[in-house]
A protein has these predicted regions:
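PAS/PAS-like sensory domains
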Residues: 28-34, 79, 87-98
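PAS-family sensory domains
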Residues: 38, 101-107, 120
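Short loop/turn elements at sensory-signaling interfaces that couple input to output
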Residues: 114-131
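Short regulatory alpha-helical coupling segments
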Residues: 148-167
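Short, charged amphipathic alpha-helical "coupling" segments at sensory-output junctions
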Residues: 7-23, 146
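PAS/Per-ARNT-Sim sensory domains
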Residues: 59-87
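PAS-family sensory domain signal
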Residues: 16-70
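PAS and PAS-like sensory/regulatory domains
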Residues: 33, 96-98, 105-114, 129
């Protein structure tokens, strides 16, 4: 009897995940952002094919592994991202709100804002994150020629954490 219950739960989980994945193309048409589904249990991230035009990923029907996703994350940001994903995977967090860099098809660093929320069953056994990646957030903060943060971004950083006086 328990085996049948587990099968039904697994089947429901798979159907629910597929439902969200099928919604992606419809939502994707209405925005410049990239919406994603992260199946935490299966360790796969799903995007529409549109992301492959900007980033060096091959179109995958069955989603991307975390290894594939990390291949386009800037090396300096990988550790931070992995720490965040592990907290989510362990159930310590149910949201993600990170800013990090991806490397596009031209080899250019692109600052992104990545936000998502976990949808899970009551026991947090089958977590699925639904979220979005936005590139436009940082376009006002970055010098297009050098890729360095500009004075507006520096002023925002100083407002958050003023320089400590040394003496």
């Amino acid at each position: 009897m328990k085996e049948k219950e587990n099968f039904e739960k697994t089947d429901h989980y798979a159907k629910e995940t597929q439902f969200y994945i099928k919604l992606l193309p419809f939502i994707d048409e209405s925005t410049d952002d990239y919406f994603f589904i992260w199946d935490v249990k299966k360790r796969r991230v799903y995007f529409t094919a549109r992301i492959t035009k900007q980033y060096p990923l091959e179109e995958e029907e069955n989603g991307y592994t975390l290894k594939q996703w990390l291949s386009i994350v800037h090396p300096c940001d990988k550790r931070m991202l992995l720490e965040e994903l592990n907290k989510i995977k362990q159930g310590q967090k149910d949201t993600q709100d990170l800013n990090y860099r991806l490397i596009d098809r031209m080899g250019k660093n692109v600052w992104i804002s990545c936000r998502g929320n976990i949808i899970a069953d009551t026991k947090h056994k089958n977590p699925i994150m639904i979220g979005r990646i936005c590139e436009n957030v940082f376009s006002l903060w970055e010098d297009e020629l050098t890729g360095l943060m500009n004075a507006s971004k520096m002023a925002m950083d100083f407002e958050k954490k003023p320089l400590e006086q040394t003496g």
